[in-house]
A protein has these predicted regions:
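Short glycine-biased active-site loop of nucleotidyltransferases that positions the nucleotide triphosphate
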Residues: 154, 286-291
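Histidine-centered catalytic micro-motifs
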Residues: 290-303
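Sequence termini and other peripheral, non-core segments
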Residues: 1-207, 399-402, 406-539
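Surface-exposed, flexible loop/turn segments at secondary-structure boundaries
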Residues: 285, 304
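ATP-dependent carboxylate activation and anion-phosphoryl transfer catalytic cores
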Residues: 306-311, 316-317, 441
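Active-site beta-loop-alpha junctions enriched in small/polar residues
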Residues: 167, 282-284
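Catalytic residues for metal-mediated phosphoryl-transfer on nucleic acids/nucleotides
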Residues: 202-281, 302, 320-460, 464, ...
Length: 539
């Protein structure tokens, strides 16, 4: 019980220092935590509760170290022991989020604080404050994100960024079993994890009607206006890059890439000129993992695509204030620039309309099949830059990645999708984030690459080692066997125990470059260059 008291009081002290609650909230906060964990004690330390000295509200970087996850773990375990939480990872997480939600300001207070900063024309200050709050409240899972493995790999396209995503929690076997027995509740609430109705939602277990849904008591959503509609602005809990934010429609409706969507993107960068914003494509295979809810993703990161070399210039007839550039990038990306927002919007819309109807069977692009299904779309990204290309200037940039989701017997998952030879590294869709040059790779690669490393080192140490047989006979390595043998043939001489994993990481980055090239509709050969020029000339 002493552990519970200490964890609760330390958590409250942390919340006070982070300006989430006030000093006079100590007793209320302590009792609220007890209620959350299904307890009626232990008694708090009254000397602590009645402290009157001013707590220094220091800059976050200078605050005393505090293990937020550790304190929440103690309290969640107490909730399990008290019968107030399921004895599962998701049950513990729901209690932790309930506690943090109770210690956070209400949405109306958060909105008032945010809009106060926006009202004095300080969007950077507004997002800094809001992002800090989301981190402090444990909604942005900083400790989990820090577990991700990251590196960059030099390629012909520039330095590609690679991440093995370890931040999202593994599914608890008990949750998986419960999900199998869950009843279908009919209409789900919230309809998906991007709906604004998630704000404050308590979550539900895998066994509940409708299945598992994460707790969102510590989620705060800022209302914003995009193209005259109400949208929500929040940060991603498992961020893939700096200040990874999400803008989502208040209406649960499908993704769509059109003039209205582009207008929303432009409105967003006018609200937050220091952020980029982009949309996943609106078709399967080339879209993201959620096509059912209209949303965008943005943040403060500069992606490799934004530093891609310029290959050639073009103009869009009728839009003399817009300059077009073909980028040296594995996907087929056209960049538009203009000081004139209206012309940029019109030019981008013209290109999207033209692309949706463009067929060039010489390179496998088919706009519509005989059944009337559309296959062409665009992954758009918008930002504002200054004369040196830094975020926040007066020049609008639109990156239009041309996409096609046609399938064939040879490539049943998609002609312009990661090909089968690379599925051992990446077989999921190439969405917005990866289009821009940041790979999000699955956690299975950690043990798999570790096992490949051991076999390569064994082969280096013993010339008689049957590398092919060892790789094929190892469940962790079988899918990587051909690739690993090729890596050893090319780089075996330089392989050491110290650099083996770095070499494998470099080679994974090279594979990611090939995967992006697979997704490009106009390849970087003579036929592809000619095909791209035909499309540009058609404008």
């Amino acid at each position: 019980m002493t552990d519970v008291r200490e964890a609760a009081q330390n958590l409250i002290e942390y919340a006070i220092r982070r300006s989430m609650i006030g000093q006079d909230d100590r007793i209320w906060a302590y009792n609220t935590i007890l209620e959350c964990i299904g307890a009626t004690g232990p008694a708090l330390d009254m000397a602590w509760a009645l402290k009157t000295e001013k707590i220094s509200l220091l800059h976050p970087d200078t605050l005393p170290d505090f293990d937020l996850e550790g304190a929440l773990a103690v309290l969640s375990e107490a909730a399990v022991a008290n019968g107030a939480a399921e004895d599962t990872a998701s049950g513990r997480d729901r209690i932790a989020m309930r506690i943090m939600g109770a210690l956070m300001p209400r949405p109306s207070v958060v909105n008032e604080e945010f809009n106060g900063r926006m009202g004095v024309n300080e969007p950077r200050a507004a997002t800094d404050w809001f992002y800090g709050l989301c981190c402090d409240a444990g909604y942005v899972r900083r400790a989990a994100i820090a577990r991700n493995i990251k590196w960059s790999t030099p390629t012909n396209w520039g330095d590609l960024e690679i991440t093995i995503n370890l931040s999202k929690p593994e599914k608890d076997p008990r949750d998986i079993a419960a999900a199998g027995a869950a009843k279908n509740a009919g209409e789900e609430y919230p309809a998906c994890q991007l709906c604004i109705e998630n704000e404050g939602y308590p979550g539900r277990s895998a066994a509940a009607d409708g299945g598992a849904h994460p707790a969102r008591q510590n989620l705060r959503v800022i209302p914003i206006q995009l193209d005259g509609e109400r949208w929500g602005f929040q940060y991603s809990p498992y961020a893939y890059f700096n200040e990874h934010c999400i803008a989502m429609s208040s209406e649960h409706r499908p993704m769509h890439v059109d003039r209205k969507g582009l207008t929303c993107l432009l409105d967003f960068v006018d609200l937050f000129p220091h952020y980029f914003i982009g949309s996943n494509a609106d078709l399967p295979i080339v879209g993201g993992s959620i096509l059912s809810h209209d949303h965008f993703q943005g943040g403060a990161h500069e992606f490799p695509m934004m530093h891609a070399a310029e290959v050639s210039q073009f103009s869009v007839p009728g839009f003399d204030q817009v300059s077009g550039t073909v980028l040296q990038w594995p996907l087929s990306v056209l960049r538009l620039r203009s000081h004139d927002r209206a012309q940029l919007l019109d030019a981008a819309e013209k290109i999207i309309h033209a692309w949706r109807e463009w067929t060039d069977e010489s390179v496998g692009v088919v706009a519509h099949t005989a059944d009337g299904v559309a296959h062409n779309t665009v992954t758009p990204v918008i930002r504002r830059v200054d004369s040196r290309g830094n975020a926040g200037g007066e020049t609008y940039e639109a990156y239009l990645a041309l996409r096609c989701n046609i399938t064939t017997d040879e490539h049943p998952l998609g002609v312009f999708h990661p090909h089968a030879e690379y599925h051992h590294i990446k077989k999921e869709n190439i969405g917005l984030i990866e289009v821009m040059g940041l790979a999000i790779l699955p956690p299975r690669l950690v043990p798999e690459l570790g096992a490949v490393r051991e076999h390569l080192l064994a082969a280096k140490a013993d010339a008689s080692y049957d590398l092919a047989g060892a790789l094929e006979g190892d469940d962790l390595c079988r899918s990587h066997a051909a690739w690993a043998k090729d890596v050893f043939a090319r780089r075996g001489d330089e392989l050491t125990a110290d650099n083996a994993i770095d070499i494998l990481h470099e080679e994974v980055g090279v594979v990611f470059g090939h995967v992006l090239d697979n997704a490009g509709v106009f390849k970087w050969d003579e036929a592809g260059r000619a095909a791209q020029q035909r499309f540009i000339d058609s404008l």
